[in-house]
UniProtKB/Swiss-Prot annotation:
The lineage of its organism: Eukaryota, Sar, Stramenopiles, Oomycota, Peronosporales. Keywords: Host cell membrane, Host membrane, Membrane, Secreted, Signal, Virulence. Belongs to the RxLR effector family. The gene is Avh240. GO terms for cellular component: extracellular region; host cell plasma membrane; membrane. Homodimer. Interacts with host soybean aspartic protease AP1. This is RxLR effector protein Avh240. Residues 58-108 are annotated as: Host plasma membrane-binding. The keyword Secreted applies. Residues 1-23 form the signal peptide. The RxLR-dEER motif acts to carry the protein into the host cell cytoplasm through binding to cell surface phosphatidylinositol-3-phosphate. The keyword Signal applies. It is found in: Secreted; Host cell membrane.
Length: 194
């Protein structure tokens, strides 16, 4: 209720201030009994105010500071600094990918389908493979498959660790199912021939 009360007070203040409108002396010819006209006052004729003067008065900046601020804003708007920021952001994201990958591989409570949804690939649907996050997901799945291959995990263990057993008949539609098929191929390829 308090925000509404504050907004109501602000609205009342604005309405009260609108009665103090400046009027040109040449346009107000007579005094009327109208309540609003009594509050009108004549505008003082002065030197033409520039918009910079208003900024200086409102913000307390001098002309040089305002000029520097405008120049920086123009550079930002033209995109010179944004390309530098984008490059820095891409570099930071690349360094963070390795950290996320190590964190996901270390944790036993993180599953591939969770990683798939955390990377926002679930929402993309069929176009997920063209996303840059899909490359990170592929790195994660390759590292996970390599780990299972090194430990010679059974296909049942991999099936359960991918939580495909909980999906039942819907397991082939899961994003983790192709990973299970890849593991089966490598598992049977590495089996000795009888």
């Amino acid at each position: 209720m308090r925000p509404y009360f504050t907004l109501l007070l602000a609205l009342a203040f604005i309405l009260a201030c609108t009665n103090l409108v400046e009027a040109d002396a040449g346009r107000v010819l007579e005094t009327t009994t109208n309540e609003h006209a009594r509050h009108l006052r004549t505008a003082v004729a002065s030197v033409v105010d520039l918009p910079d003067d208003e900024d200086e008065r409102l913000l307390g900046y001098n002309t040089v500071q305002l000029w520097r601020m405008r120049r920086t804003a123009n550079k930002l708007m033209n995109g010179k600094l944004t390309t530098q920021k984008e490059a820095a952001l891409k570099k930071w994201m690349a360094s963070q990918q390795d950290k996320f990958l190590a964190k996901w591989l270390k944790s036993s409570s993180v599953y591939p389908d969770q990683v798939y949804s955390k990377l926002g690939l679930t929402k993309l649907g069929a176009s997920a493979k063209s996303s840059p996050n899909y490359q990170l997901y592929e790195k994660y799945t390759e590292a996970l498959l390599q780990r299972w291959t090194n430990f010679k995990a059974s296909p049942d263990t991999v099936y359960k660790s991918l939580r495909l057993d909980k999906l039942g008949a819907k397991a082939p539609q899961s994003p983790s199912y192709p990973m299970y098929e890849k593991y089966l191929q490598t598992f049977f390829r590495n089996q000795p021939a009888n």
